[in-house]
Swiss-Prot record:
The keyword Magnesium does not apply. It comes from Aliivibrio salmonicida (strain LFI1238) (Vibrio salmonicida (strain LFI1238)). Its main location: membrane. It is found in: Cell inner membrane. It is a multi-pass membrane protein. This is L-alanine exporter AlaE.
Length: 149
C-alpha cells in the first residue's frame, strides 16, 4: 500500500474510522473473553480508546505505510506484506493499549494478559486490520491511494 501525494483529510478520516471501529470491536472481545475484564471495565476501556484512537489513527497509518515500504524492499510477496502489517500493528498498538488499560484501572495481571493476548491475536488481527484499513481508504476514495501486492 502506498499513499502518494500530500496529506489529505480523506486519508485521515479513513484511517480514523478504521481504527476506531476495528479497535472497539476487537478490544472488547479480547478484554471480556480472554483477559477476564468485566463488561463495565471493558466498556470504560473502549470509551477511553475512542479519543486515543482518533489521536493516533493517522500517525499509525503513516507508520504502517512506512513499514509496508520497508517490507516491499525485501520482497513483493503478499506474505512479506502481511508480516509488515503485523509488525506495524504490534509495535505501534501495544504500548498505547497498555496505557489505556492502566488508566481504566485494570490490574497488572489483566494488563499483561490483555497486551500479550492482543500481540498473539495480532498474528491474525493485524493482517485483518491492514485489509480493513485498505478497504476503508478505498471507500473514502483517498487521493492517490494505490493497492500494491
Amino acid at each position: 500500500m502506498s499513499r502518494k501525494g500530500p496529506f489529505s483529510i480523506r486519508n485521515a478520516a479513513a484511517d480514523t474510522f478504521a481504527m476506531v471501529i476495528f479497535c472497539f470491536i476487537t478490544g472488547m472481545f479480547i478484554e471480556i473473553f480472554i483477559s477476564g475484564m468485566t463488561f463495565e471495565q471493558s466498556l470504560a476501556s473502549r470509551m477511553l480508546s475512542i479519543p486515543v484512537n482518533i489521536a493516533i489513527a493517522w500517525p499509525y497509518g503513516v507508520f504502517r505505510d512506512f513499514m509496508l515500504r520497508q517490507g516491499s524492499r525485501v520482497s513483493s510477496m503478499s506474505f512479506i506484506k502481511n508480516v509488515a502489517d503485523l509488525t506495524a500493528y504490534v509495535l505501534f498498538q501495544s504500548p498505547v493499549y497498555a496505557a489505556i488499560l492502566f488508566t481504566v484501572g485494570a490490574s497488572t495481571d489483566q494488563i499483561i494478559t490483555a497486551v500479550s493476548s492482543n500481540a498473539a491475536v495480532s498474528c491474525v488481527m493485524g493482517v485483518f486490520y491492514g485489509y480493513f484499513l485498505d478497504a476503508c481508504r478505498k471507500a473514502f476514495k483517498v487521493p492517490g491511494y494505490t493497492q500494491r501486492v
